[in-house]
A protein has these predicted regions:
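Hinge/lid segment of periplasmic solute-binding proteins
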Residues: 41, 109-163, 186-187, 224, ...
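Glycine-centered hinge/linker elements that transmit conformational signals in sensory
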Residues: 191-193, 236-268, 297-299
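Extracytoplasmic "Venus flytrap"/periplasmic binding protein-like
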Residues: 64, 68-138, 172-175, 275-277, ...
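Conserved C-terminal helix/tail region of periplasmic/extracytoplasmic solute-binding proteins
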Residues: 34-42, 77, 172, 178, ...
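A structural signal for short loop-to-beta-strand junctions that line the ligand-binding cleft
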Residues: 95, 100-103, 132-170, 203, ...
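Extracytoplasmic/periplasmic substrate-recognition and gating elements
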Residues: 67-72, 77, 150, 174, ...
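Extracytoplasmic/periplasmic solute-binding protein
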Residues: 39, 149-157, 162, 186-239, ...
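Long, aromatic- and glycine/proline-rich binding clefts that accommodate carbohydrate-like moieties
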Residues: 141, 145, 355-406, 413
């Protein structure tokens, strides 16, 4: 018996030694091929962290998504943190500087290259190559912002197209026809004039036909420039083109609506209200994205949405997305990828759509009742999808954050009435070009 045990022990030792000399099957596979295994009895699941910006109510939705993910993947535990926009980016920069980043974090598409070029993001292409069907149902235009020569370092989770929100009650009372497909900027301007009124009879305008955020390009002026045949930035990302003759036509339109027609409040006037002028029932029209729908659903007036108007070069709108990235410093990239896969699945996309803030990137979900027949409010959701036909991707380039601040802050004095349009615009273009040169 003792001899049998000794022989068995020697054989077992030999097997262990031989096994140790052989390469691990996982070691010879790309990262995406490594499969997360259920924890052993009594073992602890792998913990990963996920950070995103958003309103407090979004945390509950993300937690629901996480709960469903964990039920399907008991070997992984996800902790979720949702912060407001400013706090989110400040904390993210601090964590990256300390080399303690969240495993997965949300990314605004225009800022993507600033992070990707710093080498702080994991290349997701090996994972995608292992699941080539993953992106087949994703709207192609939403992927454009995340492409790089060596693959994707991020993927979109949802997107926004900008449309015109309009107050049906104001239109009805003023006898103005609702916006129709194919309408123009001239149509919008004339409607805005009629809808701008002194409803109290005290000689002061208290109802505006149109209001818009002119600081960032996404909501108004990029659409205006594209529809007039202009561009925002050159294809090689070295020249700012917002001062071209075509672009100037769009700027002049907004300038005249504000200072000549008085149908659009200047920055000082709108700032006095301290409110969303459309939601407060002070403005009849505003261009904005789907993220306002849950908030606007509580409005006491009837409203709907219409496509952006056409200019001399046709219709145009902006498309932007929120995406996912995995930190290069993550110690659990495989598990982080599994979470992204789940959010991009029909189940994950359905849960995000139920929140009502954005448009799902999966066609099968976006073009289903899940999106088109949302319960929050009865509006023409199809307009957001139809706008893809003439949508331009919001530009993505290195130095975007600094460039947009130079443009937004530089043009701000025009909308307060402190400076003239053309000389200010020319100065801004020079400053913006300097940012591009610095980030080339």
């Amino acid at each position: 018996m003792r001899k049998s045990i000794m022989i068995f022990s020697l054989l077992l030792a030999l097997v262990v030694v031989l096994s140790a000399c052989q390469p691990s099957p996982q070691a010879t596979q790309p990262p995406a091929a490594q499969q997360t295994q259920p924890p052993a009895a009594g073992g602890e699941p792998v913990e990963i962290s996920f950070m995103a910006w958003g309103a407090p109510e979004e945390l509950a939705v993300w937690q629901k998504i996480v709960d469903e993910f964990q039920a399907a993947n008991p070997s992984i535990k996800v902790t979720v943190e949702v912060s407001d926009w400013t706090s989110y980016w400040e904390k993210l920069k601090t964590l990256l500087s300390a080399n303690t980043p969240p495993d997965v974090f949300a990314m605004d598409a225009p800022l993507y290259l600033d992070y990707q070029s710093r080498g702080v993001l994991q290349n997701l292409q090996p994972y995608i190559d292992q699941n080539p069907d993953l992106l087949k149902d994703v709207y192609p235009v939403t992927l454009e912002a995340y492409k790089t020569p060596d693959g994707y370092y991020g993927l979109p989770r949802d997107f926004q197209t900008v449309v015109i929100f309009f107050n049906k009650d104001m239109f009805d009372k003023a006898g103005v026809p609702y916006p129709q497909p194919g309408w123009t900027w001239n149509d919008l301007r004339e409607a805005a004039k009629t809808l701008t009124q002194d409803t109290n009879g005290d000689g002061k305008v208290d109802q505006y036909g149109f209001t818009a955020d002119l600081w960032d390009m996404e909501l108004t002026w990029s659409e205006g420039i594209w529809s007039h045949g202009g561009e925002i930035i050159s294809s090689d990302k070295t020249k700012t083109l917002i001062g071209s003759p075509e672009a100037l036509q769009a700027w002049q339109l907004f300038y005249d609506m504000m200072w000549k027609d008085k149908s659009m409040p200047d920055t000082n006037t709108s700032g006095q209200y301290g409110l969303d002028l459309f939601q407060a029932g002070i403005a009849a029209m505003t261009p904005i994205g789907h993220w306002v729908v849950p908030g606007y659903a509580t409005a006491t007036f009837k409203w709907d949405v219409a496509p952006m108007p056409a200019g001399p070069a046709g219709q145009a709108t902006s498309i932007n997305s929120a995406g996912f990235v995995v930190a290069k410093g993550s110690t659990h990239p495989d598990e982080a990828w599994k979470f992204i896969e789940f959010v991009l699945s029909p189940t994950g996309q359905t849960r995000l759509t139920e929140l009502g803030l954005a448009i799902p990137v999966l066609k099968s979900v976006a073009e289903s009742p899940v999106f088109l027949k949302q319960k929050t409010v009865e509006i023409n959701q199809q307009v957001f999808l139809d706008s893809l036909k003439f949508a331009h991707m919001k530009p993505v380039f290195k130095g975007y954050d600094e460039w947009s601040a130079v443009v937004g802050d530089g043009m701000a004095t025009i909308w307060t009435g402190e400076t003239e349009l053309e000389p200010t615009l020319n100065d801004v273009v020079q400053q913006a070009d300097a940012v591009l040169a610095k980030n080339k």
